Curated annotation (Swiss-Prot):
Catalytic activity: a (3S)-3-hydroxyacyl-CoA = a (2E)-enoyl-CoA + H2O; a 4-saturated-(3S)-3-hydroxyacyl-CoA = a (3E)-enoyl-CoA + H2O
Gene symbol of the encoding locus: fadB1
Gene3D superfamilies given in the database record: 2-enoyl-CoA Hydratase, Chain A, domain 1, Lyase 2-enoyl-coa Hydratase, Chain A, domain 2
Keywords: Fatty acid metabolism, Lipid metabolism, Lyase
Upper lineage: Bacteria, Pseudomonadati, Pseudomonadota, Alphaproteobacteria, Hyphomicrobiales
Pfam families according to UniProt: ECH_1
Role this protein plays: Could possibly oxidize fatty acids using specific components.
Organism: Rhizobium meliloti (strain 1021) (Ensifer meliloti)
Enzyme category, top tier: lyase
Name of the protein this chain belongs to: Probable enoyl-CoA hydratase
Enzyme Commission no: 4.2.1.17
């Protein structure tokens, strides 16, 4: 499949998606999000892909949603079409996904990064939810995911003032897992994805599911859910291989089944 707004490739067992609207600082529009949905579904369906990296350009991961596209909307149109509701598909990707963020990740761009499983940021990265300056609020999960990531006080600060925070503050706040030099960003993200993809795919996908459900369940429910997933992995060939390799002191050769 050819894409108008994305660059899509595979490197070994890693799927790499690069946002490619340089003239608009990778602003998110309907075409880009439809193409991103298609690319993610293709990678999810490809058994040869074990992890995904989502990247932007050096200047901007994504500078926000495309304001020109949404400017003329009214409430009825937006409500009936569930505007932005369909963009949640990114968070529903089943395989582990890493956001490699350089430059601006603002508004919808920050929300898109937060839909990934974790964020690796360049030292140049800038995060923020500046929707308040446009007379609106975050609409792609910013008020929800940001609060879960950094806590109420920091989320209120960022959302109510519209200010940006740099990569160092984002890492201290828990939004970002690692900060690296700009020239090492893609290498670091691909390296992490390659490591994840080298493990059992069923185990990696269940680990992702368990962590994500922890945000929705009570502790007792979450513990039961985790335990059932753990137990279910004993039905896989990879569990047998992983434990046999550990006992034999050799490297496991997972078959992803």
């Amino acid at each position: 499949m050819s894409y108008e707004t994305l660059l899509v490739e595979t490197q070994g067992r890693v799927g790499l998606i690069t946002l490619n609207r340089p003239q608009a600082l990778n602003a998110l529009n309907a075409v880009l999000m439809r193409e991103l949905d298609a690319a993610l579904k293709a990678f999810d369906a490809d058994r040869a892909v074990g992890a995904i990296v989502l990247a932007g350009s050096e200047k901007a991961f994504a500078a926000g949603a495309d304001i020109k596209e949404m400017q003329g909307l009214d409430f009825v149109d937006g409500y009936l079409a569930d505007f932005l509701g369909g963009w949640e598909h990114v968070a529903n990707a089943r395989k582990p996904m890493i956001a490699a963020v350089s430059g601006f990740a603002l508004g919808g761009g920050c929300e898109l990064a937060m839909m990934c499983d974790f964020i690796i940021a360049s030292e140049t990265a800038k995060f923020g939810q500046p929707e308040i300056t446009l007379g609106v609020i975050p609409g792609m999960g910013g008020s929800q995911r940001l609060t879960r990531a950094v806590g109420k006080a920091k989320a209120m600060d960022l959302i109510l003032t519209g200010r940006m925070m740099d990569a160092a503050e984002a890492e201290r706040s828990g939004l970002v897992s690692r900060v690296v030099a700009p020239d090492r960003l893609l290498e670091e993200a691909l390296g992490a994805a390659e490591k994840i993809a080298s493990f059992s795919l069923p185990a990696a996908m269940m680990a992702k599911e368990a962590v994500n459900r922890s945000l929705e369940l009570t502790l007792a429910e979450g513990l039961r859910f985790e335990r059932r997933l753990f137990q279910s992995l004993f039905a896989t060939e990879d569990q047998k291989e992983g434990m046999a390799a550990f006992v034999a002191k050799r490297k496991a050769e997972f078959k992803h089944r």
